[in-house]
From Swiss-Prot:
General function of this protein: Displays ATPase and GTPase activities.
Origin superkingdom: Bacteria
Binding site for GTP: D72, V73, R74, S75
Family that this chain belongs to: Belongs to the RapZ-like family.
Protein's name according to its UniProt entry: Nucleotide-binding protein ML0563
Keywords linked to the UniProt accession: ATP-binding, GTP-binding, Nucleotide-binding
Pfam families reported for this sequence: PapZ_C (PF22740), RapZ-like_N (PF03668)
HAMAP family for the chain: RapZ_like (MF_00636)
């Protein structure tokens, strides 16, 4: 958020984003995207220098209006450092947005093994133990983050899109909603705020002519949405989400991920997610996108 009432320049404003999260989850890539969007990016700036950098940005004549700081878990007392930075910035009427990057344990292990690097908290432990230790350490940070991005199944272009949607312009007037389909057989999405199970609908997998298709095909979509209760479910769920979104806005939260799950993430969840996105887009104060996490995995 922007800050003002700085002693040196009452009209000064600066937007601050703190990028943190699990090592190997894409903090560096997120920082590069923010830099491409015109943000001034400070990578691994010591916590005690963050407020100094903000003061520099608030000073008369400074051209820094958007500051992104990548915070590294390897700094001792990391969680306390983050809390301290937030308190200091609050004295300047600045409430930074915190972006938390994460990925599944399996994906993090794969990335470290591919790059032949050790985890910063690994020490004499195994790689998996180092990842688990970091996840425990950062749990309080994740719990208070403004935006959580799970990069497990996210390509670099997909990550870029997520960052651009959140920070590419003035998002203060809108709430960004991601409707994510998934398959329960592959696990719950780690970044979901709300999870809905649509396995109560008949499975197109058992219809021979629909089995090889997906929820993006009209035949499957018509089959799923034509089931008794499907239309009423969508209308009811749309009203429920309206209440939730209003609550998010009152609390100052601007990002929400709604996960829709079926068995394999191929038919029912995809069709329902697409239909729900269409209903939500009728709200002019919502920026909505759909993401099909497990489509193509079968």
């Amino acid at each position: 958020m922007s800050g003002n009432n700085h002693p040196g320049d009452a009209s000064a404003e600066i937007d601050v984003v703190l990028v943190t999260g699990l090592s190997g989850a894409g903090r560096g890539t997120a920082a590069k995207v923010l830099e491409d969007l015109g943000w001034y990016v400070a990578d691994n700036l010591p916590p005690q220098l963050i407020t100094w950098m903000v003061d520099f940005g608030l000073a008369a004549g400074s051209r820094i209006t958007q500051l992104a700081v990548v915070m590294d878990v390897r700094s001792r007392g990391f969680t306390g450092d983050l809390d301290s930075v937030r308190r200091e910035l609050a004295t300047r009427n600045i409430i930074p947005r915190v972006v938390f990057m994460e990925a599944s344990d399996d994906m993090l292990v794969r990335r470290y093994e591919q790059n032949r690097r050790s985890h910063p908290l690994q020490g004499e432990q195994t790689l998996a133990e180092g990842i688990a230790a970091e996840r425990r350490m950062l749990a309080p940070v994740r719990a208070t983050a403004d935006l959580i991005i799970d990069t497990s199944a996210l390509s670099v272009p997909g990550l870029r899109e997520s960052i651009e949607r959140a920070f590419g312009g003035d998002a203060s007037a809108t709430t960004s909603v991601t409707v994510e389909s998934f398959g329960f057989k592959y696990g719950l999405p780690m970044d979901a705020d709300i999870v809905m199970d649509v396995r109560f609908l008949p499975n197109p997998h058992w219809v021979d002519e629909l089995r090889s298709l997906t929820g993006q095909h009209s035949a499957v979509r018509d089959y799923v949405l034509g089931q008794p209760g499907a239309a009423e479910f969508l209308r009811t769920y749309r009203r429920l989400l309206s209440l939730v979104v209003d609550g998010y806005r009152r609390e100052g939260k601007r990002y929400m991920t709604v996960a829709i799950g079926c068995t394999g993430g191929k038919h029912r969840s995809v069709a329902i997610a697409e239909a729900l996105m269409g209903l939500l887009q009728s709200d002019l104060q919502l920026s909505v996108r759909v993401l099909h996490r497990d489509l193509g995995r079968e």
